[in-house]
Amino acid sequence: MAYIEFRGICKSYDGVNQVLKNINLDVEKGELVTLLGPSGCGKSTLLRSLAGLEDISSGQIILDGEDITNTPVQKRGIGMVFQQYSLFQNMNVEDNIAFGLKIAKMDKNEIDKKVKAAIEMVDLTGKEKSYPSQLSGGQQQRVAIARAIVMEPKVLLLDEPLSAIDAKLRRELQEKIKRVQKELKITTIFVTHDQDEAMIMSDKIHLMNQGIIEQSGKPVQLYTHPVSKFAAEFIGHYNILTPVELTAFFPEKRYPGNYYVIRPETFMLSKEPIEDPAYLTFDAKVVDFISRGNVLRYTLQCKDVVFTSEVLFRSFALFEPGATVHVGIEEHNLLRLND
């Protein structure tokens, strides 16, 4: 039995348009699971339904073997961190973190011990007496996380907590959250629209689209084997091609179905003809390229088909716009979608 079970979850605000459409998913104890998807797909609504902040129209939510569908928010044992830090501006770091423990009338010595441990865990030692206005956005979010984990919740819910933080700090906080989650072995559900963030953070990803679960699996599974055009477009920079477009590469072959995807990094580019029989080969013209640090992304054209390829930077293997290159791909990297 899973630690968290969503069973047939439906949600409609007007009785007609469903925000959640018969959601069924499991979360194992100790996992960090991400609900990933574009704005309006239902991911935050599903998260809030687990917290008790949203009523569901039908279905059942089970936590640790107990049906909590109608359990009041305060009795669910769930901690939640939002995009907005929601800190008490008139309280310092220590008091913000201790607030819930004081409400629970915990012994002062125990409160001090737990708050100290939480501060150390989120690397805020030395900031105990600082007020929110004296902290950076990243530090304020760490206070919010510490305030949630100090209560030792059964589940930690994170609703796009890093979206308002700049890229460098976001990466640091991603690493901190993942470290804290693993140390505490706390079951965590993370909501984001950022596929890179989901790939970095997650043990498992549930990709949502218009109120349904489009695809579930480990990050590498979603990246290497998207099941639909939506999944391929949302998860990675795939080349999405029709069977007709594929025949521009390989005129002698015929491909059934509607769509195929090719990951940019699976193409081999060469100045010399590719003799390896494991590769299907064709020629293409370089349209343009951009540098992304140690990765070069080439825009290439074969007949009327434009596609992209990514290769590690090597100064001796640069291809200038206008050049003709030999392209190879192993056939198992042509992935047929279910669409």
Describe the function of each predicted region:
Residues 59-67:
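Conserved ABC transporter NBD signature motif
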Residues 36-38:
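The feature captures the beta-strand-to-loop junction immediately N-terminal to the Walker
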Residues 16-18:
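Short coil-to-beta microelement around the adenine-binding A-loop and adjacent beta1/P-loop entry
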Residues 51:
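Helix-to-loop junction immediately C-terminal to a conserved catalytic motif
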Residues 32, 73-227:
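ABC ATPase nucleotide-binding domains
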Residues 248-339:
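Non-catalytic connector elements of ABC transporters
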Residues 5, 26, 62, 326-328:
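ABC ATPase nucleotide-binding domain
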